[in-house]
Regions:
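Alpha-to-beta junction loops
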Residues: 12-19, 38, 104-110
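Secondary-structure junction motif
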Residues: 63-82
């Protein structure tokens, strides 16, 4: 099931879920399976020419684009680059990563997103900005279930397969 709010439906139609979250409710059983980096992405023309955006503090002159479900990505990034008080010209929230990347490709601002979304997109109009800056996302992908669901063999097998798959990366 790929619908939103999968964690709230555990035990009510879902045996387990893979969720993107900062943390899990302690009443749930959870295993972090993957944690991504935050990338800054913009139109190629933003990093070219005499007015190129080349320094993190220049983000203050730009519109920042953030996925609505990953609202803390910009805060985590600005803290990591040592600019905790940096405020952009504007912040636009998107419900779709694909729409956010298209807006970035058209030069509407700088997208703050997870590395894996950019890797899957492959658009020559986009460039990773501030490539020398590595910032871990505050969000992780979690395997989650109600503790009693671990009594079900398919749930245990799925969990074990996920853990094995991502430990090899």
């Amino acid at each position: 099931d790929t619908a939103a709010h999968s964690l709230t439906r555990l035990g009510d139609g879902l045996d387990c879920a893979i969720a993107l979250a900062e943390s899990l409710d302690p009443a749930l059983y959870g295993v972090r399976i993957y944690r991504d980096n935050i990338y800054t992405v913009g139109a190629r023309r933003l990093v070219q020419g005499p007015h190129a955006i080349t320094r993190p503090e220049q983000v203050g002159e730009m519109t920042v684009m953030i996925h609505r479900e990953l609202g803390d990505t910009f805060s985590a990034w600005r803290d990591a680059v040592g600019l905790p008080n940096l405020e952009p010209a504007a912040i636009d929230y998107y419900d779709s990563g694909q729409l956010m990347l298209e807006a970035a490709a058209q030069g509407l601002g700088i997208a703050f997103l997870h590395q894996n979304l950019l890797s899957d997109y492959g658009d020559e109009r986009l460039v990773r900005m501030f490539a020398d800056v590595e910032v871990r996302s505050p969000y992780s992908y979690w395997f989650a279930c109600r503790p009693r669901a671990l009594d079900l063999q398919p749930v245990r097998l799925f969990r074990d397969w996920l853990v094995t798959l991502y430990q090899s990366d």
